[in-house]
């Protein structure tokens, strides 16, 4: 009964994320852009699969991945062996990232890099930086220092790298901090932080996700220097015309076995690692062990449904709409529509509401959750608009990234460090599943129709969306600092103590 209630809650959250975009798409298709009936029917079916898949997946990830992170983190703290903590962190970082659904979707849409090569490259980057995160927690190294040093190195590498790979590299950093990796990394960090007994130990467990997102950027930039690109068709382009319901059913039935195999291979490393750890060291009791295994089954089923819906019916419609809206006067709708989608995507993301509440609590109510929510919505909406502006004009992604990250890192000197840690952790919150599954194909369709370069002009959308919370959260932190200083300067009202109150008629 309890699990059923939890599943219903997750399905409601998934529906709140998916339905706003679906309704916008339906409105566009009925009013502005004629879409083939078969493709639209496929989109409706894909929407249902996305809702069910996301609901099952998020419940399963909470039951399994978060628990595995907690259990292994707690066990590692007891060993107090640095080499063991680092080796396990690397292996877990790689294994958990391979199964990240947002990364699977992004990799399927990159036309010039083999999907498996890109996923493994990104996963190794996360694994290496997860090791660095453990070192930072154990030795209390400044998060700001690490962010400045590594982003400086990343941007130096970016200016020296092949310009065609830049946008994909920064997008990779945005999609890896998704619903699979974030709860796991956070749980592992909290467990390892418990080794320390000083007052800053808990605060240092924040910032792990933000630091880990640098790893994929660096590793993909390195990949661009050594890997020979291979032009290929993206999955968003690969939608064949659907002539009848039998053809529609055939498309989905043929896709299910393919994604069942993909998800099996993606989840296998983390499952094998957990089982080995369970029988060698962890030795959970029967009930907790079974709960984790049931959670893994939920995760598996959810991922299969999610990826099938995305690749067969959801992303292809985004691609088709983007292409159709470049015709004539409709091109001027690309930017406002992208901004509208950005507004609804961030508003519908459940993790965003948790972030808003965190900021409200940190600021002791000086920054309300509502004010934080509106600020994030405006920021992500602006990111969507800037991404489409790039598609139309071909402006380099580096113009926005250099300015944005410079501002984000500069703000870290003026706000409490916990605000900085939460800000860099929250980048993946904003770039939720719908950014990679719909908005990116939408940008790709528009870019191809305009004759642009998809690798340089369409990719980068996820990176812009992920960058905005870094600035927004810290701006709110700066407002909190200003308000706090003003409150300290205001003179307190003199306390005259309790005195006798004289009524007017008594004085007469």
Regions found by a protein language model. Give the residues of each.
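Intrinsically disordered, low-complexity non-transmembrane regions of multi-pass membrane transporters
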Residues: 1-14, 18, 69-83, 197-201, ...
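Interfacial loop-to-helix junctions that mark the boundaries of transmembrane helices
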Residues: 8-14, 35-45, 77, 110-119, ...
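Hydrophobic core segments of alpha-helical transmembrane domains in multi-pass membrane transport
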Residues: 19-32, 46-56, 88-95, 125-136, ...
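Transmembrane helix-loop junctions in multi-pass membrane proteins
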Residues: 27-41, 61-70, 95-110, 129-141, ...
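Alpha-helical transmembrane segments and their helix-start/interface "positive-inside/aromatic belt" motifs
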Residues: 11-17, 41-47, 75-83, 143-148, ...
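Transmembrane helical segments that form the transport core of multi-pass membrane transport proteins
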Residues: 45, 239-351
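Juxtamembrane and boundary regions of transmembrane helices in multi-pass small-molecule transporters
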Residues: 2-4, 133-149, 164, 168, ...
